[in-house]
Each structure stands twice: as structure tokens, then as C-alpha cells.
């Protein structure tokens, strides 16, 4: 793909075609390398505040590691991307340590299976909008928000987690996270949830009473160092498949009214 026009003129043409509902073959990215080269050139031009809207990546399935370890970016506007065929977002924004806000609302994630590490180590991130995401095919969400240490709120209440198998360390180190509504999540296929809330020290309450944990094998360190988590409802949890040591230090450093006795969760 060649961009011979000045960038403003090029995007003016793209916008006109968007308004007319037109898509030209030459406006599509045909492989990941082509996309990465274009993004790097734009980031070098634009610096810490990057705007790259309305890209057609509908031919691509793999966006893993796309912005990984790009530490210069503070704000990123990538709204309007056509992502209908993407199935892999692993580590897509991992290590974007300076990124402060990101709005991905409305992205088509209906075919995504892998979100492992997608926002991991975005340690400056304060605002993240994922509204409208279709997660019905996601299998891996482990480590997805780990070390997002400045994120205070996150709305994942409408996520479809019915196919998720691994969610360990999902919110590890989200030490500023104050509220989280996961009460409606279907976790019937989840096998690993160890370290999920490790060091979420600002969380004060969690209602997980409706979680189906019948297939979980490892819950170790699940609420470790959740120092302010006093209200926690785990009533009805099934730990029959949790292996030996799979619940080690589950509530260590957590004031929640539970403990583990003979590999079972019991009230203190």
C-alpha cells in the first residue's frame, strides 16, 4: 500500500468515501506488517497524541502486539476501525506505559478469541471505554488488565464470558480500581482464576455469588492483598474440582469474612 498524497488530503478522501458508504480495495490493509509500518510512521509524525481513525483492517485476523511497548503515546484515537474479522488481540496495547485514555467503544470484537494481556502494564491508563464489545467468543482473558494501576473504574458488566476458559491474573495489580460489577458473568467453562484480584487494594465490595465455579481448578491467591475488601459474597461457590494447593493463600491480606478449611471456602 502506498500513500502518495499528504496525510490530510488522504484522510479527506477516506472520510468522503466513508460518508458515501464506499470502500476502495487500496484503502484496506492486507497484512499485519503493512499495518504496523503505517502505524509506526504516523506515531513518529504525531508524537504523544495520536489520531488514526477509520482504518479498514477487516481483512486481518491478528492484531496481537500492535501497539506493544510503544511508550510515547499519551492519547490514542483509533475510533471507527473495521475489525470484524479480528480473532487475536493478545498484548495489543501491552506496555503502553504512558497511555492515559482510550476509547474503543463500538469496536466489532465478535470474532475475538484471545484477549490475553491486551491492556497489561498500561500503568498510566485512567479512562478506558469498552462499551459495546461483543465478547461472546472470547476464550482467554487472563492478564488482560494486569498492572493498570491508575484505572479507578471499569465497566465490564455486560460482557459475555460464556466461553472463557482462563481468567487468571485478570486484574492483578489494579490497585486503584474502586468498583467492579461482574455479578452477571457466566464462568461455567473457566478452569483457572488464580490471582484474578491480586493486589486490588482499593476494592471494597464484590458480589460474585452467582458465579459458576464448578470447573475451576485453581483459585490460589485469588483475593490476596485486597486490603479493603470487606464485603464479599461467595455463597454457592463450588470448589469440588479445585486441586490440592489450588486455594493456597486465597484470602491472605484480605479482611473478607472467609477462610479456607480442607480445601473448602467457609465463613470465619
Residues of each region from the PLM?
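Negatively charged
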Residues: 2-268
Amino acid at each position: 500500500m502506498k500513500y502518495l498524497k499528504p496525510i490530510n488530503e488522504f484522510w479527506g478522501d477516506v472520510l468522503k468515501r466513508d460518508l458515501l458508504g464506499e470502500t476502495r480495495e487500496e484503502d484496506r490493509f492486507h497484512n499485519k506488517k503493512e499495518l504496523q509500518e503505517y502505524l509506526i510512521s504516523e506515531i513518529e509524525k504525531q508524537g504523544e497524541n495520536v489520531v488514526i481513525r477509520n482504518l479498514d483492517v477487516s481483512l486481518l485476523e491478528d492484531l496481537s502486539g500492535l501497539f506493544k511497548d510503544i511508550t510515547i503515546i499519551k492519547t490514542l484515537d483509533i475510533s471507527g476501525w473495521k475489525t470484524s474479522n479480528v480473532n487475536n488481540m493478545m498484548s495489543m496495547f501491552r506496555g503502553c506505559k504512558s497511555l492515559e485514555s482510550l476509547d474503543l467503544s463500538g469496536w466489532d470484537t465478535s470474532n475475538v478469541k484471545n484477549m490475553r494481556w491486551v491492556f497489561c502494564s498500561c500503568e498510566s491508563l485512567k479512562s478506558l471505554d469498552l462499551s459495546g464489545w461483543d465478547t461472546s467468543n472470547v476464550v482467554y482473558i487472563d492478564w488482560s488488565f494486569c498492572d493498570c494501576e491508575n484505572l479507578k473504574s471499569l465497566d465490564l458488566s455486560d460482557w459475555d464470558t460464556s466461553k472463557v476458559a482462563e481468567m487468571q491474573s485478570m486484574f492483578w495489580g489494579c490497585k486503584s480500581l474502586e468498583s467492579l460489577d461482574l455479578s452477571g458473568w457466566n464462568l461455567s467453562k473457566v478452569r483457572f482464576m488464580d490471582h484474578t484480584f491480586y493486589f486490588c487494594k482499593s476494592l471494597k465490595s464484590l458480589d460474585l455469588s452467582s458465579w459458576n465455579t464448578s470447573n475451576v481448578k485453581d483459585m490460589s491467591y485469588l483475593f490476596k492483598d485486597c486490603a479493603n475488601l470487606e464485603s464479599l459474597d461467595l455463597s454457592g461457590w463450588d470448589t469440588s474440582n479445585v486441586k490440592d494447593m489450588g486455594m493456597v493463600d486465597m484470602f491472605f491480606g484480605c479482611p473478607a469474612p472467609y477462610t479456607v478449611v480442607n480445601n473448602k471456602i467457609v465463613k470465619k
